[in-house]
C-alpha cells in the first residue's frame, strides 16, 4: 500500500484551477510525474464535485497514479479511491473501516507528533506535517520545522508528507530531512499553461531520483 507513496503529491485548488483548467492541468501534473493527486474542493456543489472527481479518477488510472479525495468519505467510498482527513474532518479509524485495508488514507498532523501517533494508530497510510513555509492555502496553519521531520522519520514507519509553501527551491531540504512526499499546490498549478505545469511537475519529481 505504501510502495508508491513517494514523490510529488499534487493538490488541486478550485479557485486556482477555475475556467476549465482543472482536468488539463491535473493531467499535466500526472504526465510530469505526480504520484498522488488530491482533489480538494470545499464547495457544496455535490454534482460538480462528483463529475470532477470521476474524471480525475480516470486520469489517475490512466497514468498509474493514486487519487485522494479531501474530506469526503462518501465520495471516496463511492469512487473506491483514497481519502485525506484533517483534524476536524471525521474519524480516520471509521474511514479505514469503511474503505478497507488497501485504500490510501492520509491524515493532517500539523506540527504535532502526538497527532501523527493517533493517525498511525487509527490506520493512516501516510502522515502529513506542515505548514513548513508561508502558505497561500492555509496562511494561519501552525508552523512546522525540519527538526520535526527528523523526529518523525525515526519514530514512524509510515511515509511522511511535507506541505505548506513548498517550492522547487525549498523542497530538497524537506526531502533530505525525511519527507517521502512533498505536497504542492501553487508552486505547481499557478501556471500560465498545462505545459508549464508538466515541466514543474517533472522538476519536482526529479528531486526524488
UniProtKB/Swiss-Prot annotation:
A cellular-component GO term for this protein: cytoplasm
A biological-process GO annotation: thiamine diphosphate biosynthetic process
Entry EC no(s): 2.5.1.3
Enzyme class: transferase
Pathway assigned in UniProt: Cofactor biosynthesis; thiamine diphosphate biosynthesis; thiamine phosphate from 4-amino-2-methyl-5-diphosphomethylpyrimidine and 4-methyl-5-(2-phosphoethyl)-thiazole: step 1/1
Pfam families in the record: TMP-TENI
Sorted UniProt keywords: Magnesium, Metal-binding, Thiamine biosynthesis, Transferase
CDD domains assigned to the protein according to its UniProt record, in alphabetical order: TMP_TenI
Disulfide bonds: none
Binding site for 4-amino-2-methyl-5-(diphosphooxymethyl)pyrimidine: 38-42, 70, 108, 138
Family according to the record: Belongs to the thiamine-phosphate synthase family.
Job of this protein: Condenses 4-methyl-5-(beta-hydroxyethyl)thiazole monophosphate (THZ-P) and 2-methyl-4-amino-5-hydroxymethyl pyrimidine pyrophosphate (HMP-PP) to form thiamine monophosphate (TMP).
Name listed for the protein in its UniProt record: Thiamine-phosphate synthase
Record organism: Ectopseudomonas mendocina (strain ymp)
Gene: thiE
Amino acid at each position: 500500500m505504501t510502495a508508491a507513496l513517494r514523490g510529488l503529491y499534487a493538490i488541486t485548488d478550485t479557485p486556482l484551477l477555475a475556467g476549465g483548467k482543472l482536468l488539463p492541468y491535473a493531467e499535466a501534473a500526472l504526465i510530469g510525474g505526480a504520484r498522488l493527486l488530491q482533489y480538494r474542493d470545499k464547495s457544496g456543489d455535490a454534482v460538480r464535485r462528483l463529475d470532477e472527481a470521476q474524471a480525475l479518477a480516470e486520469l489517475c488510472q490512466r497514468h498509474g497514479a493514486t487519487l485522494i479525495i479531501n474530506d469526503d468519505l462518501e465520495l471516496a467510498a463511492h469512487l473506491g479511491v483514497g481519502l485525506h482527513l484533517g483534524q476536524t474532518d471525521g474519524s480516520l479509524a471509521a474511514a479505514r473501516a469503511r474503505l478497507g485495508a488497501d485504500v490510501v488514507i492520509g491524515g493532517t498532523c500539523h506540527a504535532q507528533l502526538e497527532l501523527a501517533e493517533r493517525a498511525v494508530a487509527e490506520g493512516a497510510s501516510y502522515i502529513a506535517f506542515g505548514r513548513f513555509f508561508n502558505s497561500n492555502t492555509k496562511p494561519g496553519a501552525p508552523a512546522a520545522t525540519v527538526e520535526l521531520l527528523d523526529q518523525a522519520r525515526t519514530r514512524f514507519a509510515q511515509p511522511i508528507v511535507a506541505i505548506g509553501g513548498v517550492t522547487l527551491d525549498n523542497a530538497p531540504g524537506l526531502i533530505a530531512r525525511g519527507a517521502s512526499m512533498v505536497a504542492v499546490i501553487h508552486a505547481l498549478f499557478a501556471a500560465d499553461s498545462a505545459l508549464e505545469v508538466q515541466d514543474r511537475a517533472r522538476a519536482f519529481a526529479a528531486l526524488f531520483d
